Amino acid sequence: MGGVNIYAIIESGGKQYKVTPGQLVEVDLLDLAEGDSIELDKVLMLNDGETVTIGSPTISGAKVTATVAGHIKGDKVFAYRFKAKTRNHKKMGHRQLYTVLTIGEILTGGAAEKPARKPRAKKTNEVTTDGA
């Protein structure tokens, strides 16, 4: 399989997305113009190819840079209201607005440089034979 799999799990709009550099991601509408850059700092998990870092709840210092590629509308979702025996019915439709992001870099920000915890020294009970 060869290549290094660098990816991150980010949060945007209350939803979580697994992103890799160069990927196009559709997130809920953001108030940004096409071509604007954004830094997503809610990184929940980070895999840099060697180590996996899991945040609690987020990883401090880790960021994902992205550029707005455009805005689109999703597929139309229909809701239908119907009342029996009264000829009362209503069909409603909704199209969700999305922002398309092009993922740039995944910056660790020193997230993988956490020092390992040292094991605790075990206490030993010494027994003396001199009666003290």
UniProtKB/Swiss-Prot annotation:
As one GO molecular function, the record gives: rRNA binding
**Keywords for the protein's UniProt record, in alphabetical order:** Ribonucleoprotein, Ribosomal protein, RNA-binding, rRNA-binding
Q: Which InterPro entries match?
A: bL21-like (IPR028909), bL21-like_sf (IPR036164), Ribosomal_bL21 (IPR001787), Ribosomal_bL21_CS (IPR018258)
A GO cellular component term found in this entry reads: ribosome
Superkingdom classification of source: Bacteria
> SUPFAM superfamilies annotated for this entry?
L21p-like
Q: Which GO terms describe its biological process?
A: translation
Annotated region Disordered: the residues are 111-132
Q: Which NCBIfam families match?
A: L21 (TIGR00061)
Question: How does the annotation summarize its subunit structure?
Answer: Part of the 50S ribosomal subunit. Contacts protein L20.
Q: What does this protein do?
A: This protein binds to 23S rRNA in the presence of protein L20.
Q: Which family does it belong to?
A: Belongs to the bacterial ribosomal protein bL21 family.
Q: What is this protein called?
A: Large ribosomal subunit protein bL21
